[in-house]
C-alpha cells in the first residue's frame, strides 16, 4: 500500500519543501504525520506547495486522474491564504488535518467545479459543528486542497450541503 514515511523534524520538513519540484511525479511525499500547523504556516508564508500523500488508486480513477497509481493530494499556499481569509474560524491546525477530515467524512460528494474540473466535497460532523473540505483534481495528476468551511449545526441541514448535493446529482 502506501510507503511508510518517517516523522521528520521541522528543519528536515522545510528542506524537503524548499527543494521539492513544484509539480510532477518527482515531487516528494511529505506524509500526513509531517503536516502540522507549523508546516502549514511555513507553506503559506513561503509561497510553497507540497504533496501530502498518495491518493488511493481506485479513488484517483473515479476522479479520472491520468495516472491513478501515482496521484497525489497536494496543498499549496493559495488554498491556505483563501481559507484563512474567507473562513476566519479555521486555523493552521484545522488545515493541517484536512486529509484526515476528508477521509473520515460522514459523506463525500463528487461534482464539477465552475471550471468543469472534478471536485470532491467531504462533510465531517464533529459534535455541534461540521467541517467541509473541498478538493479539486487538476491536469497535473493532483487532488488539490481548494477550500474548507466550518459551521455550527448538522451538515445535512446546511445550505452548502443542499447546494453541493444538488450539483453532484446533476453532474452524474
Locations of regions flagged by a protein language model:
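Ribonuclease/tRNase effector modules and their secretory precursors
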Residues: 1-172
Amino acid at each position: 500500500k502506501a510507503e511508510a514515511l518517517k516523522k521528520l523534524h521541522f528543519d528536515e520538513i522545510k528542506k524537503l519543501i524548499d527543494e521539492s519540484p513544484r509539480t510532477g511525479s518527482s515531487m516528494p511525499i511529505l506524509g500526513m504525520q509531517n503536516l502540522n500547523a507549523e508546516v502549514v504556516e511555513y507553506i503559506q508564508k513561503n509561497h510553497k506547495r507540497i504533496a501530502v500523500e498518495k491518493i488511493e488508486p481506485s479513488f484517483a480513477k473515479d476522479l479520472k486522474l491520468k495516472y491513478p497509481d501515482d496521484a497525489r493530494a497536494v496543498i499549496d499556499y493559495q488554498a491556505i491564504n483563501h481559507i484563512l481569509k474567507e473562513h476566519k474560524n479555521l486555523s493552521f491546525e484545522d488545515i493541517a488535518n484536512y486529509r484526515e477530515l476528508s477521509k473520515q467524512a460522514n459523506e463525500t460528494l463528487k461534482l464539477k467545479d465552475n471550471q468543469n474540473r472534478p471536485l470532491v466535497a467531504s462533510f465531517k460532523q464533529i459534535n455541534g459543528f461540521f467541517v467541509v473540505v473541498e478538493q479539486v483534481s487538476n491536469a497535473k495528476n493532483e487532488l488539490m486542497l481548494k477550500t474548507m468551511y466550518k459551521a455550527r449545526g448538522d451538515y445535512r441541514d446546511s445550505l452548502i450541503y443542499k447546494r453541493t448535493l444538488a450539483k453532484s446529482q446533476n453532474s452524474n
